């Protein structure tokens, strides 16, 4: 009887220990370690070094060669996996594409697919694959049910959590290439020089993983940060303010992606406060970003509490503006007219 109790106790301890060791942070990347695979790349770079190291540690098959090569059938982040002569070749026009190829090869191994059977060609269905965080600067998360925000703004840029790299790795492993760091109910402070340096610290970690940073911005930021008397998108001083701010941003973060804007909805300021349309507001921001190839994601989920039909309101505001937005503006609609509807 004592032996049976001891055995059950021992099993329970082992089980609990294993449970404690698994915190879910590795997601699908629970990969073999120290496989010491033979991997070659055309050169060294932060991105290629990651691809080589991931394969070197976890790939258990034939030698792998990474090749940067133009291919009319491949988009910039597309890739091809080919097996011949007991060697696997990964090709892509870009380093990021090769990183995606490396993760795809490891995914095929993890799911038991026969890598030697066929040639694999992959192209992304969407060029922009962006996560939108609803994280506030005090680390609370709107509609967040899993603890505090990853971004510890008080400690940035001097203290860099290991979780930032793990976050970038997880995103790259499934092809995510952009992230909006902050809540659409944005604080103007995110555009201050102090906070742009904090954003830079994250962008520098994310960059080798092909992950670009975007920010939600408050439309009235010129009034909040520099005491302008207006945020009218047709006012020359306002236009100049955004141009100078964008110049500062791209000096600090050269590959910055652009802005996400929630305007004239749920109390947020916007162009309609100054008698302007959503198109005029979005286009002003887009023109300032255009020299840097940045984009504006302008939310179409807008409504006033005075009208219960939210779907109708959004339609009435945006349908007449069809065709008036700049080419680097994306009018971002929700899956449905209300929050959290399934596609």
For the regions a language model picked out, list residue spans one by one.
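Catalytic-core regions of glycoside hydrolase
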Residues: 227-343
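Acidic, contiguous N-terminal accessory segments
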Residues: 10-85, 93-96, 115-119
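Active-site-proximal beta-strand/loop segments in catalytic clefts of secreted hydrolases
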Residues: 42, 68-69, 92-93, 182-184, ...
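Bacterial N-terminal signal peptides that target proteins for export
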Residues: 1-9
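A generic structural signal for short coil/turn motifs at secondary-structure boundaries
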Residues: 46, 90, 187-191, 268-273
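Structural alpha-beta junctions
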Residues: 56-63, 110-111, 203-210, 283-296, ...
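Feature activates predominantly on carbohydrate-active enzymes
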Residues: 51-54, 74-78, 83-260, 290
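Hydrophobic beta-strand segments of well-ordered beta-sheets in folded domains
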Residues: 35-39, 129-131, 177-179, 259, ...
């Amino acid at each position: 009887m004592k032996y049976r109790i001891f055995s059950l106790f021992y099993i329970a301890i082992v089980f609990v220990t294993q449970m404690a060791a698994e915190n879910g942070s590795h997601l699908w990347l629970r990969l073999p370690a120290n496989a010491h695979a033979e991997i070659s790349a055309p050169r060294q770079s932060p991105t290629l070094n990651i691809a080589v190291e991931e394969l070197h540690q976890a790939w258990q098959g034939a030698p792998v060669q990474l090749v940067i090569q133009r291919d009319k059938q491949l988009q910039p982040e597309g890739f091809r996996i080919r097996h011949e002569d007991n060697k696997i070749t990964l090709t892509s026009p870009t380093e990021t594409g090769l990183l995606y190829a490396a993760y795809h090869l490891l995914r095929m191994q993890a799911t038991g697919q026969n890598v030697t059977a066929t040639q694999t060609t992959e192209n992304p269905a969407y060029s922009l694959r962006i996560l939108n965080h609803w994280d506030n600067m005090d680390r609370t998360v709107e509609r967040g049910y899993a603890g505090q925000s990853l971004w510890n703004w008080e400690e940035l840029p001097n203290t860099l959590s290991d979780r930032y790299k793990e976050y970038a790795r997880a995103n790259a492993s499934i092809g995510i290439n952009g992230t909006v760091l902050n809540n659409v109910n944005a604080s103007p402070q995110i555009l201050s020089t102090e906070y742009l340096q904090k954003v830079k610290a994250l962008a520098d970690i994310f960059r080798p993983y092909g992950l670009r940073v975007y920010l939600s911005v408050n439309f009235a930021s010129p009034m909040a940060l520099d005491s302008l008397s207006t945020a009218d998108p047709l006012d020359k001083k306002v236009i100049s303010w955004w141009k100078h701010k964008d110049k500062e941003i791209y000096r600090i973060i050269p590959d910055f992606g652009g802005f996400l804007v929630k305007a004239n909805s749920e109390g947020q300021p916007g162009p309609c406060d100054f008698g302007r349309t959503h198109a005029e507001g979005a286009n002003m921001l887009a023109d300032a970003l255009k020299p840097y190839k940045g984009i504006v994601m302008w939310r179409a989920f807008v409504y006033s509490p005075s009208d219960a039909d939210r779907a109708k309101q959004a339609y009435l505001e945006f349908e007449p503006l069809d065709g008036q937005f700049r080419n680097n503006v994306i009018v971002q609609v929700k899956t449905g007219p209300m929050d959290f509807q399934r596609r």
